[in-house]
Amino acid sequence: MTMTPREIVAELDKFIIGQNDAKRAVAIALRNRWRRMQLGEELRREIFPKNILMIGPTGVGKTEIARRLSDLAGAPFLKIEATKFTEVGYVGRDVESIIRDLVDVAVKMTREKAIRQVKSLAEEAAEERVLDALIPPARGGFQGEPTAEEKPTEKKESATRQLFRKKLRNGGLDDKEIEVEVSAHPSFEIMGPPGMEEMVSQLQGIMSSMSSRRSKSRRLKVKDALRILGEEEAAKLVDEDQIKSTALASVEQNGIVFIDEIDKIVKRDGAVGADVSREGVQRDLLPLVEGSTVFTKYGMVKTDHILFIASGAFHIAKPSDLVPELQGRFPIRVELKALTADDFVRILTEPKASLTEQYTELLKTENFGLSFTKDGIKRLAEIAYQVNDRSENIGARRLHTIMERLLEEVSFEATDKQGESITIDADYVNKQLKKLAEDEDLSRYIL
């Protein structure tokens, strides 16, 4: 991570409107990962990440920050829902599977990077195998036959091979079918009960390694053969042991886990029965966040320096309802603000791939023009804010519902009206949505 905090915030600004406190907090946390790695090993061991707790209503950008952060991090990153996990002893996934999944992400990232480095060598090897299939090598003669007689044949064969190589690189043979030997991959999935994912994964790995030693003959088009053989050759060239050790080190030093919906595992006041397992999940999470050692199929992983970012709406429970030990492990608290009508106007127009741009480009594929006026966008934002205010406040997600309702007729008829166009202004928005927005009973069910 070589980006400065200011650059990280600027990048997040392209996709997320407002919420500067949250952006600054995650930007500083990301940069601190880089700063720590510049220190000596002894001091580096003593510096632990400051975990972040993001608090705010639904639809204000918590999950979107996580999504964009994963693109910027350049490090093993995993986003999980806290509600997917159960206390040890209950049916479901245990929290240690978070670290196992994070290691899987790291191994995949490291392998992809290693494969990119050997891509040109792998492509050359794949090309030779395809040429061997197109021009089978000449069979050897009788024992003791003079080698001098073989040389003209070799030259002739080499010239033919060069001609085919040129055609192959120009794409002239892409659709020709050839028969090649490829590794046989298992065509079955091992199913296991909840909580046994690690054992199932190991069994799957054993079966895959056994079957990968065998090969089978397949008839493929040349372009498909080049791709499949290229992948095979790349897999032969990379060092799997090196990939695993690099991935484990990357997880331990730079791993980031984003825990969404953490408020859903808070025990509610006066609740009995199944709610007991909510507190159990928190207590199971505690060792991971504090720092522990987790066994994975690639080796042991220490979680001491993994950064945890948690988020939740906390509209029923409060952050203080988390078990005290877990509260203490999230020292940085960031509150995200509810969105206003002005924020909705900005969300509809400013971000990269904004909603208005998405619908415009979608209908452009039908040769149908769609444009929005400023007053049309303002009216859309006002209606979204009003509906949120009167019924359940779901933040920016309300805009998706309203846009779909607004453009339902246009999207349906666009195919029959190619070459035409429409401008969405305030009058059009009122015509389509005003009655629904004003009728509280209807807006609850439709918008």
UniProtKB/Swiss-Prot annotation:
The keyword Lipid biosynthesis does not apply. GO terms for molecular function: ATP binding; ATP hydrolysis activity; peptidase activity; proteasome-activating activity. Keywords: ATP-binding, Chaperone, Cytoplasm, Nucleotide-binding, Stress response. SUPFAM superfamilies: P-loop containing nucleoside triphosphate hydrolases (SSF52540). ATP binds at I17, G59, V60, G61, K62, T63, E64, D260, E325, R397. It is found in: Cytoplasm. Residues 148-159 have a biased composition (Basic and acidic residues). Belongs to the ClpX chaperone family. HslU subfamily. A double ring-shaped homohexamer of HslV is capped on each side by a ring-shaped HslU homohexamer. The assembly of the HslU/HslV complex is dependent on binding of ATP. PANTHER family: ATP-DEPENDENT CLP PROTEASE ATP-BINDING SUBUNIT CLPX-LIKE, MITOCHONDRIAL-RELATED, ATP-DEPENDENT PROTEASE ATPASE SUBUNIT HSLU. ATPase subunit of a proteasome-like degradation complex; this subunit has chaperone activity. The binding of ATP and its subsequent hydrolysis by HslU are essential for unfolding of protein substrates subsequently hydrolyzed by HslV. HslU recognizes the N-terminal part of its protein substrates and unfolds these before they are guided to HslV for hydrolysis. This is ATP-dependent protease ATPase subunit HslU. It comes from Coxiella burnetii (strain Dugway 5J108-111). The gene is hslU.
